[in-house]
């Protein structure tokens, strides 16, 4: 096992990534105030693709895309288009901080799906404990935070389905997308997701121009969370290995809650804090039971479940 120490620069980049991805829920809340959800989702994938495409081309990361066109297109639907739509519709009735906590349940869905899809990823020992702890957290949130109205409960269900879609995309990236780097795969998926979303977005274009704030929020979300965030994450991945780099994923819901409370004036309840602690700790246990760092863990490693996508 190769141990890699986290430098101050690596910690800084990791915190920046977590802050960007955590901010995606706040930006979503702002964007959907004045944008149809399909339009918002298209702007998010389109801006991400515009940021990543020149870099992927310069690095030769799209080599093999022609051979993997259909798997990458499917990845774009499952990993990007579907969850972005679900998250957009879900956040219409759920506060951004709570949305961040619910979506952070992705590793729990991964552990559950592994029972049927991938025995190598199946939970054992502390992974099962983490799965149980995380499920308790989700049930707590659904019972205390989402039970106020049918709209809120349905919104929470959409957010959990979005997390499930992220988890499915991880398995899809491992089993179907071969011979491409994570950068190439996520860039191709951004392009594919944009193609799929375009006709739906055109059909839901508003009669009037959207406000500057919501439009800027959607574009910033795509450029920073979708584009720059991934590039910085790959940098941390190269310097520290996957086990340490994934710390960013567990900081995301905390940033989402802070942004929601401080910038959007959302309430912070004891149930939300307890749910955050249970879901994040359970997800960490479920996802880290077999993690190892190897010398080959670089941004150019081939696509694996955690390497393309649980985000953001």
What are the roles of these predicted feature ranges?
Residues 39-50, 78-79, 84-122, 126, ...:
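Specific alpha-helical transmembrane segments that line the substrate/conduction pathway
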Residues 19-28, 53-103, 113, 140, ...:
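Specific transmembrane alpha-helical segments of multi-pass solute transporters/efflux pumps
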Residues 1-42, 89, 148-175, 299-312:
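Glycine-/small-residue-enriched transmembrane alpha-helix faces in small-molecule transporters
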Residues 52, 73, 105, 113, ...:
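Hydrophobic transmembrane alpha-helices of multi-pass small-molecule transport proteins
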Residues 2-4, 45-46, 143-144, 198, ...:
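C-terminal-most transmembrane helix of multi-pass membrane proteins
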Residues 6-11, 33-42, 64-70, 128, ...:
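Juxtamembrane helix-entry segments on the extracytoplasmic side of multipass membrane proteins
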Residues 43, 80, 99-105, 170-195, ...:
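Helix-helix packing/entry segments at the starts of transmembrane helices
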Residues 52, 110-116, 131-134, 148-204, ...:
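Transmembrane alpha-helical segments that form core, pore/gating elements
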């Amino acid at each position: 096992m190769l141990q890699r120490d986290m430098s101050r620069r690596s910690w800084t980049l990791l915190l920046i990534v977590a802050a960007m991805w955590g901010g995606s829920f706040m930006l979503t809340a702002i964007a959907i105030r004045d944008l149809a959800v399909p339009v918002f989702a298209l702007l998010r994938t389109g801006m991400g693709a515009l940021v990543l495409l020149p870099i992927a081309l310069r690095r030769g990361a799209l080599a093999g895309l022609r051979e993997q066109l259909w798997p990458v297109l499917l990845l774009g639907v499952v990993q990007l288009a579907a969850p972005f739509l679900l998250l957009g519709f879900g956040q219409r009735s759920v506060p951004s901080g709570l949305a961040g906590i619910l979506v952070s349940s992705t590793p729990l869905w991964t552990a559950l799906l592994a029972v049927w899809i991938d025995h190598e990823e199946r939970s054992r020992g502390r992974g099962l404990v983490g799965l149980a702890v995380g499920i308790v957290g989700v049930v707590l949130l659904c019972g205390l935070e989402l039970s106020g109205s049918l709209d809120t409960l349905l919104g929470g269900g959409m957010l959990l389905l979005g997390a499930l879609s992220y988890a499915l995309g991880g398995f899809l990236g491992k089993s179907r997308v071969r011979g491409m780097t994570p950068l190439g795969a996520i860039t191709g998926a951004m392009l594919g997701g944009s193609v799929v979303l375009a006709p739906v977005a055109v059909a839901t274009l508003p009669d009037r121009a959207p406000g500057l704030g919501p439009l800027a929020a959607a574009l910033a979300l795509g450029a920073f969370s979708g584009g720059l965030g991934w590039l910085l994450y790959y940098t941390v991945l190269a310097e520290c290995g996957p086990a340490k780099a994934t710390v960013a994923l567990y900081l995301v819901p905390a940033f989402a809650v802070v942004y929601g409370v401080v910038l959007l004036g959302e309430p912070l309840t004891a149930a939300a804090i307890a749910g955050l602690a249970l879901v994040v700790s359970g997800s960490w246990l479920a996802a880290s039971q077999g993690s190892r760092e190897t010398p080959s863990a670089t941004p150019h490693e081939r696509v694996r479940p955690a390497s393309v996508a649980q985000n953001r």
